[in-house]
């Protein structure tokens, strides 16, 4: 499809790729994007309506919730629970799955989401976003159970995010590549602006929080040290570091112009070997990156192959340019020898 196509038209055209499609999924995606428009508007108006700052509560992760975390979470729940497309929902901000109201028919999909990734940055105007993952319910027409959500990332039927920054963008994939849409506020519609986004196999940019260097395992320390040595080191070229501190913003940059993102294994707390949540962040972003020609790994395991052990499981994440990710994996395996 061509640049300038509306999201509504794009969804209809894409639905035709699936013989026998009922239209349920198209309806689900349209309803979800409506909630993303609402959240984007709240983010942009945050300081004007007193929506910035802490809500005075913690989420299941033990993290301080921002007011916009709660607003965004409620926006998605209330936009989606009445539609009849879903059997259940799970949110990073909630301990347990969210049940569909009793008077609403149960659908055949499950929605998992991080309502406002990077919300700690809202007070300083840095890009944030909503990340989502859609799975098929193992049994359609009944209430979703906890085990239904614990599917490996390869089972996702759709993944994406909405980015709230200099513009409101929606980026998603249903397994036919990655496409990006920009919200035209004059008509209230997302318009195709980034067709078939691709990640180059090689890169000279990396994203990592260098302040944690001493806590990483040796393979990651080796990899980053070599990048920092630039032309004087074994890579024999210079690399640039970019770090926003908002995963959705860092991954968006990689989808637009390439790079590698690392939030590696951290040895400070054995109970939290990684910071990022498998179901709400790692799986959907890994799906997008692979669809764009990149790779995603924990350092030892392909992320999309991991069978979740719980709703809020955390893992290390290394994703982006295929050749760079494979190099980091090889360092973990001890199989990469400098020529």
Swiss-Prot record:
Cofactor info, note text: Binds 2 magnesium ions per subunit.
GO cellular component assignments: cytosol
PROSITE patterns attached to this UniProt entry: FBPASE (PS00124)
Entry GO MF terms: fructose 1,6-bisphosphate 1-phosphatase activity; magnesium ion binding
Binding site for substrate: 117-120, 209, 275
SUPFAM superfamilies xrefs: Carbohydrate phosphatase (SSF56655)
Residues that hold Mg(2+) 2 according to the record: 114, 117, 281
Reaction(s) the record says it catalyses: beta-D-fructose 1,6-bisphosphate + H2O = beta-D-fructose 6-phosphate + phosphate
Enzyme Commission number, as recorded: 3.1.3.11
Locations listed in the record: Cytoplasm
Matches recorded under InterPro entries: FBPase_C_dom, FBPase_class-1, FBPase_N, FBPtase, Fructose_bisphosphatase_AS
Name of a matching Pfam family: FBPase_C
CDD domains: FBPase
Catalytic EC class: hydrolase
Superkingdom of the source species: Bacteria
Cofactor annotation: Mg(2+)
List of residues binding Mg(2+) 1: 92, 114, 116
GO biological process: fructose 1,6-bisphosphate metabolic process; fructose 6-phosphate metabolic process; fructose metabolic process; gluconeogenesis; sucrose biosynthetic process
Pathway: Carbohydrate biosynthesis; gluconeogenesis
Keyword line: Carbohydrate metabolism, Cytoplasm, Hydrolase, Magnesium, Metal-binding
The family this protein is said to belong to: Belongs to the FBPase class 1 family.
Subunit composition and interactions: Homotetramer.
Name used for this protein in its record: Fructose-1,6-bisphosphatase class 1
Organism for this UniProt entry: Acidithiobacillus ferrooxidans (strain ATCC 53993 / BNL-5-31)
